[in-house]
């Protein structure tokens, strides 16, 4: 896979999702299905979107004991998604169990990505709420190395950290970066953000963009703007 814009379809129903996707005549944007939509509609929404020809990032952020995550991934592997994820904080045994569960009998599997720190987390929250008394970029780098050593394909991180992650873990270690906003847009609840062009310059492999596209007056134009700034 090359650089791509992943559209976060954070909708409450299949009806809303398809009404949004139907606007993209002749285009098949890479789609992220998150907790809200998946829990509302179940695995059938994945099958329906996949049948339309979209690549899918299933963003459920699994985090549990290793055996539970392994069994959950063994179920998710049958949905034919392109990318799925878990929390790096679950540690090495959980990540290795996830890989084992996700791998099909023929050896194929979706890409498996670990979430380091959510882009809504800032230094104050890291120290006061999570009780990690380290700089946030140091924590991300540690999680990135742990993830790579466990055999995963990359991490979800702020675009602020993507370049450093590639320096530490290599150019083939993928960085998927939310927290992307247009220069003239609202940052919302994100604390660590960049524009699509800045994310491209710093080396992000994929950007995940939600409200700047889904809530735009013209979602297709907003998507095309993202693609032009990040991919072209």
What function would you assign to each model-found segment?
Residues 2, 68-72, 77-153, 158-161, ...:
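Conserved anion-binding
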Residues 26, 52, 79, 150, ...:
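Structural motif
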